UniProtKB/Swiss-Prot annotation:
GO terms for biological process: cellular response to abscisic acid stimulus; fatty acid elongation; very long-chain fatty acid biosynthetic process. This is Fatty acid elongase 3-like. It comes from Arabidopsis thaliana (Mouse-ear cress). Probable very long-chain fatty acid (VLCFA) elongase that controls VLCFA composition and functions to inhibit abscisic acid (ABA)-mediated stress responses, including regulation of stomatal aperture, maintenance of primary root growth and inhibition of germination. VLCFA pathway and products may function as signaling components acting upstream of sphingosine-1-phosphate, ceramide and the heterotrimeric G-protein complex, in lipid-mediated regulation of abiotic stress signaling. Belongs to the ELO family. Pfam families: ELO (PF01151). The gene is HOS3. The chain crosses the membrane at residues 35-55, 75-95, 129-149, 157-176, 181-203, 205-225, 248-268.
Amino acid sequence: MSTALINSITYFLSEHPYIVGFRWSNSQSWGSTWSFLFTSISLYIAVSSSLHILLSAVRRSNRSVPLGHIPEIHSLLMSILSATIFAGILLSAAAEIRDTRWLWRRSKTATPLQWLLCFPLGTRPSGRVFFWSYVFYLTRFLHMFRTIFAVLRSRRLAVSQLFCNSVMAFTSFLWLEFSQSYQILAILSTTLVYSVVYGYRFWTGFGLPGSAFPSFVVNCQLVLVGCNLVSHAGVLTMHLFKGGCNGIGAWGLNSVLNGAILLLFLNFYVRMHSPMRRHINKMNSQRNA
């Protein structure tokens, strides 16, 4: 890859004037109000539930609604967006560390890792990193379409899926509204995993060979949960021993919600790997052979 191309990518992902001058505010950022957030989440739950009830009442057979390759196109779009956000926030974090490191002497931040875990008190939601956090927040609403696809394809609506998607949108909003610490590492790990998972779904959606591991997607999500746990422990340590982290109240609420998601995921993971579930999957495979 040529130096000119690398410089061009770096400019458009971290040095563009709009990215550098970004500021999260109700007047400048679409979707930045509490009313928009709660209305969108309520609409998502209402539409998903209504569609599930309607299809269950109208379509008595087990046939799914034909969607063509719309889910696969959605997966490709989400994979590209996730990879772009990952690259953008990685380059932006490096640029912010380069430009603001001299200010860290006013706080107890000593290393880039400490800054990634714990924003200094008084951090404002503006600049490169928060631009990509805003883009990530908007993509949470695109992610919700997977629930619609699941209802149309199988007429199943998982309450856990509604809860997890709603929580992701809510916590992404908290990151911006309260300049919450830890969000950079959370976005990096989430977008990295999502770019792989959505790319895998796009690949297998067209009937191409899948992973040799049947639980590939679930294992990727398990890695993401593990990264979140380590990051949360790091934030708490920094807050207690380094004089406080910005947005720690929002981080506390975020931790509670992530704990609820963790319990739901572990319950699903245990049930999926139980002997009874493996026996059922084996019987279904033999029946379809």
